[in-house]
Amino acid sequence: MNADAKTEIKGRERYKAGVLKYAQMGYWNGDYEPKDTDLIALFRITPQDGVDPIEAAAAVAGESSTATWTVVWTDRLTACDQYRAKAYRVDPVPGTPGQYFCYVAYDLILFEEGSIANLTASIIGNVFSFKPLKAARLEDMRLPVAYVKTFKGPPTGIVVERERLDKFGKPLLGATTKPKLGLSGKNYGRVVYEGLKGGLDFMKDDENINSQPFMHWRDRYLYCMEAVNHASAVTGEVKGHYLNVTAGTMEEMYRRAEFAKELGSVIVMVDLIIGWTAIQSMSEWCRQNDMILHMHRAGHGTYTRQKNHGISFRVIAKWLRLAGVDHLHAGTAVGKLEGDPLTVQGYYNVCREMKNAVDLPRGLFFEQDWADLKKVLPVASGGIHAGQMHQLLDLFGDDVVLQFGGGTIGHPMGIQAGATANRVALEAMVLARNEGRDIAHEGPEILRAAAKWCKPLEAALDTWGNISFNYTPTDTSDFVPSVTAA
């Protein structure tokens, strides 16, 4: 692109031409210095052959703010210079020819307060199907404090949840009921009881268990809460079960949540696929009713997994913290689901830190101040077992829920034994860590020593000790070493 093609055309000349390049319409400004109140989006773009990357970046800025395909005279009726998003930086993606990181700044006035639906309608509403781009991915986003303060965030938060459960200094343990579909209400409740009695803190509905012919939702809630109450009485610990209230309408979701509350549940669950407005609505209900809100990220892989097109999960995690969830499935790194260890740690940092620093290896391109918004408790779930306890504790620390579904329900000695194996493995590993031992390297030895006194743990290690899912992650962090928010 020549210099003239990058220079904004102003005044009457602007409105004589029917079609101008986006850079000429003012959507590119290489000298722009983002304001503290600007929202900044980092896109990975793959322009079509022959499309200049600066023009492609300007097109992204234009189509995600005020532009259309031609000049419109009604621009003159607005403060268009303020309302236009501004692409201000383009960097080649290291080691990936034809792809570029482009930085786009948006004035805060473009967005409705406290609405993820409005934010996403602008940022991702149109540009991802734009013909001049082969592909586009939203890699990261800096949310200005003034905008963050318009959201209420998680209804409970990590600190209050731990106080309610009276459990501190170690990860929480959970399991997803298996098989996820097909059990009767009574058998489902028995699985819940066995897991909780064996030592777990939580049991969980899976993403697609709602109200099917084989088990009506009311039956499941009744049997599950009977199991929770019985296990709590037997163990003397506060227990819970994530009751999935996901349904076809908000009215039905509220109906189910109210019934869960009447039964004494401390937590309800929704799936990501219900949409942003529904998520924020359920978060507000939980805030008003002192309930913990668990978020299952069902469906996220359809747009987060591929590196060249879609949305990074770190951005989804940021939006969900704003929207207000207390728990969020954020990957395991060592389990069966996609996840590079450093990238997954970046997701956890988004959930748990009060201020994120720039951390390029973990995919965090911007500083992010969360303005006292409560923390989200990440959940590690999917293909993990007791033999990986040292890796999980070393990677993620204490503030995490470790959920062993198959690693509990599939134990050769039964469900309760599976839960006990996980509890003993965790307690042994936390004790070793607190004594100053190097659990990352001594973990297998520590587990085997504990297994001498715990037959369920011994059986778990014999069954799964060598099981791992060693695949090359598709989503790893690419970065330019000099990248900063400016």
Swiss-Prot record:
Mg(2+) binds at K204, D206, E207. Keywords: Calvin cycle, Carbon dioxide fixation, Lyase, Magnesium, Metal-binding, Monooxygenase, Oxidoreductase, Plasmid. InterPro entries: RuBisCO, RuBisCo_large_chain_AS, RuBisCO_lsu_C, RuBisCO_lsu_C_sf, RuBisCO_lsu_fd_N, RuBisCO_lsu_N_sf, RuBisCO_lsuI. Pfam families: RuBisCO_large (PF00016), RuBisCO_large_N (PF02788). GO terms for biological process: reductive pentose-phosphate cycle. It comes from the Bacteria. It catalyses: 2 (2R)-3-phosphoglycerate + 2 H(+) = D-ribulose 1,5-bisphosphate + CO2 + H2O; D-ribulose 1,5-bisphosphate + O2 = 2-phosphoglycolate + (2R)-3-phosphoglycerate + 2 H(+). One of its GO terms (molecular function) is ribulose-bisphosphate carboxylase activity. Binds 1 Mg(2+) ion per subunit. The active site is at K178 (proton acceptor), H296 (proton acceptor). NCBIfam families: PRK04208.1 (NF003252). The basic functional RuBisCO is composed of a large chain homodimer in a 'head-to-tail' conformation. In form I RuBisCO this homodimer is arranged in a barrel-like tetramer with the small subunits forming a tetrameric 'cap' on each end of the 'barrel'. RuBisCO catalyzes two reactions: the carboxylation of D-ribulose 1,5-bisphosphate, the primary event in carbon dioxide fixation, as well as the oxidative fragmentation of the pentose substrate. Both reactions occur simultaneously and in competition at the same active site. This is Ribulose bisphosphate carboxylase large chain. The gene is cbbL.
